[in-house]
């Protein structure tokens, strides 16, 4: 029967993350022996965060997920769901709109609602939404995306229906295991599509970001994390602007910087403050997590795990990553 002969093809047909490398690579151990995670720490003193790259839906993925009754993404996270579930906070970049029908891939994304449900069911409990595709379906697409995310009670940052909503919900304050994390999110642009008032997209503007950082500090968080949609697509090294912004963000008080947009993996740094000895994680680009991209080095990305611990202070105790690979959709062959 064709369904048994092509079981493996069917499992890979959604162009989803298929496997992570068996061996976890420790970022901290590579750069500093002083940050091993060997100390005994009670669970309430520890916060485990997971960051993954771009969640996308190209036309091949949408077509592959179509069923007679809708869209099925249930196999999308089969091989990584357990890893996602280990995190207290699992954070991803939603780089599509949920703008409703017609569902389309590149260049103006609108994914089926079932894609968001699968993301939620996989264990992602925080989304960032400010990216160059935030306005692919204009005002209605931005608002519908936010409304659907809110309907699943997923905290999110980056785009807002109006100023009142942004003032109330931003910076995004995440409280877990006795920790308070302020999450910021910005994009370099929206592919030339202007935002329609009263909607708001968080663009990279240092004047605005500086104000947001000060507002973050006012709520006395244990850490401020900035998710930046920046850089040049398909480039494996950060550009001057990324480096400048990373330096500037940390100088202004951001503890850790997580990047996306290039669709390929870029370097990771752990910086040590020469005065306080604090450790700052900078990930220039996580690469892709779910996509149908075929350009060189775009068929995968990183899952970066960060462990914060709290005793007399809050510190970055351990950090490691896994590589992930995405399989492109394959058509079933009838025999």
What is each of the regions a protein language model found here?
Residues 14-15:
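C-terminal motif of bacterial Sec signal peptides marking the signal peptidase cleavage site
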Residues 19-333:
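Acidic, metal/ion-coordinating pockets
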Residues 2-8:
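Sec-dependent signal peptide recognition
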